[in-house]
Amino acid sequence: MADSGHSISVTFPSFHSGGKEHIIRTGCGSVSVTVCGDQEKPPLITYPDLALNHMSCFQGLFVSPESASLLLHNFCIYHINPPGHELGAASIGIDDPVPSIEDLCDQILVVLNYFRLGSVMCMGAMAGAYILTLFSIKYSERVTGLILISPICKAPSWTERFYNKLTSKTLYYYGMCDLVKELLIHRYFSKEVCGNPEIPESDMVLACRKLLDERDSVNVWRYLQAIDSRRDITEELKSLECKTIIFVGDSSPFHDEALQIAEKLGTNCSALVEVHACGSMVTQEQPHAMLIPLENFLKGFGLYRPCRYSNSPRSPLGPSSIDPELLYPEKMGLKLRPIKLRVSPQPRAHKN
């Protein structure tokens, strides 16, 4: 794949103040990257699931004061959007070659080289988790650690292929219609928030439906084609050298695959967090459930929440402000596998 030649930078109204969008040209099309935070800090890259961008996939986590203080204190965030999934994206030409899952993986290398990043922390959800895991297998020296949300590792099952085919054909001929939105909503969320004849949908799901209306159907179709052509990387997981934490809702259609990934990685360098009554998108549905496991995971890299947040009574992280349930994860329905981390290469040095 050809390396990036040029980039366009524009001010971007993000849920992080000061975020800037960069459009980076790669050998298989352009990719949008929104950079948030101090670029002198260690980098964390994110990659979302099908039909989502960084805001609709990760906003719940990053707008939480507790999680935001932990992540933005320690990292500069590079939100990578799938081609054509950024806000206001134009429709990619129907005759343009559809990138493979390997192409999307290699685009990440172009992004890292463009920003002159060395080893990065990675956070991905569902299809985005697959792409970042594949990237970690291919370019292990460029990955410090993995934060995976409802990850997948196998080729599509017959059931998934059926739904992908249905979604693909409907997108192609009818666009982002109600059927497609319904299929995607149940991919993302648990029945607890999707509603029923007696209980209305949650505001979160209603907001997601509205965001899906803004997605370009051709661009979503192209991402789906790449996802549907993925290969099984289960056996290659054994070669992963980086520390990994996995979050998965027990109602996620990818729950079993997430457990299999955790089993393949073993407990020496991975941790599994199962969230009760939650779908695939833990970052949106139950972001508070990620806080303590994330904090413990990042401690293995020498990273921490800033003292000024954790000790100040005015801070959202002050003891009087923390929901008592956060101190006792089992009360939130979390099943935690002990985090056993062995020594491995540390993230890029923090520059003062």
UniProtKB/Swiss-Prot annotation:
InterPro entries: AB_hydrolase_fold, NDRG
Gene3D superfamilies, sorted: alpha/beta hydrolase
Pfam family, one: Ndr
Tissues showing expression: Pollen.
Domain of life: Eukaryota
PANTHER family: N-MYC DOWNSTREAM REGULATED
Family in the record: Belongs to the NDRG family.
Entry protein name: Pollen-specific protein SF21
Organism phylogeny: Eukaryota, Viridiplantae, Streptophyta, Embryophyta, Tracheophyta
Gene name for this UniProt entry: SF21
